[in-house]
Amino acid sequence: MAAYPKSPMGSGPVLEESHIYHAEATIFSGHLEHPIKQTIEPYGRVVLENTRRETLITQSVGETDIEGLISFKRGHTRVVGTQVKHKTDIFGNDHAGWVTLSTAVLEGFNVVDIITADRVVAQVSTEHPMVEGHVPTVTFLGSRFENFRIGGVPVEVELDLGICGSKPKGDRPYIEDADFLDRVERQLEHAADTKGLPETLEKQYDAKIAYIDDLKRRANGDPKLARNGYSKLQCSLIKSIGPIPIPGVRTFGNLIFIPNFGTVALAELEVGIGPSHGNGFSHEQDDPSGKPSDSNYFTLNMFDLKLGCPVGGGGSGPGVSGNGGTRP
């Protein structure tokens, strides 16, 4: 077995920094329950999986019709992993590091002639810096809805692309960052205050707010709330949804209820920490201390459909996910 190189002071091994890229993108996937039962396999799925190599993978899908119920004219996906060794912006900020980009685009989308959109883009990019590079800077710039309509009525959607904020200080995970947790809590409280909120949603929002309070106490060092496994937090890029003048249509946060159709949740985001992808390397090889290596991940789905009557089933997309791990 190869030995680690020794530092000049002889204090221990000097480990060369490296990065494992991981990203995924999918145009659309789901299932139908009635009037027929059918699995909708992921269209255009591409995966940049557990590799240290700089990589670009793309895929395009042409016109697609799923039993005359769900259709789209075209779509494409893209995942990129690359290292930028020397880069500063016009303000002199250093952006050297490892960058991962994941993109999914859906065009000419139609769900039983009720949900339509000319173009929907899901995009996430993470930048792991060379110094304190275990937690990345993240951006969702490029994500958007173009000419999104319900029953032919335009739906005005305002996105909060900065929901995650700046990279947390001290290389802390996002779900242990007080500023991020405060923003998500305010988002949930605003949705929970909606007039006429159904009891089922009220309970869900209350549970999510209580969970955030637990995350805050754990981040502040409460020994009773030490990490048990890996954690995650759901929120949304939606800042606001404009009025939809259709009888019976209601909005609750990022969720839209449509009578005789079901619900559609917009720009659903999951932020979490999980085991760093090791590409076959053990923790002992990468970190002599044996300390587990965590990886921050970000998963975004622009549409999450729950169909009721007369069509039953569900589906999501376009969707992207990005993470990766820097070692040691």
Language-model features: locations:
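Extended, solvent-exposed, non-transmembrane regions
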Residues: 2-328
